[in-house]
Amino acid sequence: MATINFGGVLENVVTREEFSLNKAQEILKNETVAVIGYGVQGPGQALNLKDNGINVIVGQRKGTASWNKAVADGWEEGKSLFEVEEACKQGTIIMNLLSDAGQIQAWEGMKKYLTKGKALYFSHGFGVTFHEKTGIVPPNDIDVFLVAPKGSGASLRSLFLKGQGLNSSYAVFQDATGKAQERALALGIAIGSGYLFETTFQKEVYSDLTGERGVLMGALAGIFEAQYNVLRQRGHSPSEAFNETVEELTQSLMPLVAENGMDWMYANCSTTAQRGALDWKGKFREATEPVLNELYDSVLSGKEAEIVIEANSKPDYREKLQEELAVLQQSEFWQTGAQVRKLRPTK
């Protein structure tokens, strides 16, 4: 492990330098890695493992769009693509990459194949952390761990193809064989992680649920809408309001922040922007911190998990979800966004 100073706090991380791909391949050489679920994370992780020389099979319900995608990606029925239970039977490491709702539904069929010495892998701590609500309690004679890439499966794959990678967290929940940590780290490297930092199942799920409801999606979309609405109410055109709210951020500022940091951005903008941003940053922090604390408490109490499980268990959930998404898609805000994106220069 390498010890890195993160803003004055020392953390141990695992990089490709001290845990090479060759080492990962050696650890996994006798394993059959069964990737269960070919939806959000499944394709990226499975294809990266395959390209890195790991023995991988995919388990997916036949006849679904995800099954068809797996076939299109080169997985062969009966050779590397199987129904879920058959893949679980063959796998020595079962990577449970189904959705949280899907994991609950598939658990009874999956757990009978979790025999002594096998490993159960997650990319999210939801099912195990909220086991009282999900019913997911792994047998005590298997390894249980997670590797959680900090981004989508599509990003994991595209960065891998460029020779890059996403950072990932990892956690060992149960070490029955004495090999759980090396199995977890080997898989973390083999799926294309840039570096791995240690967490726990609980911390992973608490930070993840807070992040996606907060800055990553919920808060971001909410503040987008708020600023757009204010500009429109004050007489600005849809195009101007969208450009000043979203387009400049995503196309100009965030790539620079990603490359250089927000501190660099503050030091390299106009003096007018610089002064205003410094003055208003604290006000936004003070306004949003109580909301984020309320959000974290809701996650910690299990309320957010309960909402998700209850919503996903309703027979008309997908229909209701499409109605909610349609409101977003048909709003002036995002209809304007669609037109703005079409006008981006392509050359």
Give residue spans per PLM region.
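Rossmann-fold dinucleotide-binding core
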Residues: Y121-R213
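NAD(P)-dependent Rossmann-like dehydrogenase/reductase catalytic/cofactor-binding core
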Residues: A2-F6, E11-E17, Q233-K347
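Glycine-rich adenosine-cofactor-binding loop
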Residues: E31-L49
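Glycine/serine-rich phosphate-binding loop and adjoining beta1-alpha1 elements at the start
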Residues: M1-T32, R61, V172-Q174, G192-T199
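NAD(P)-binding Rossmann-fold cofactor-contacting core
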Residues: G44, K50-W75
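Rossmann-like NAD(P)-binding element
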Residues: R61-K62, D73-T129, V137-S152
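Active-site-proximal catalytic alpha-helix in oxidoreductases
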Residues: G178-Q233, S239-V257
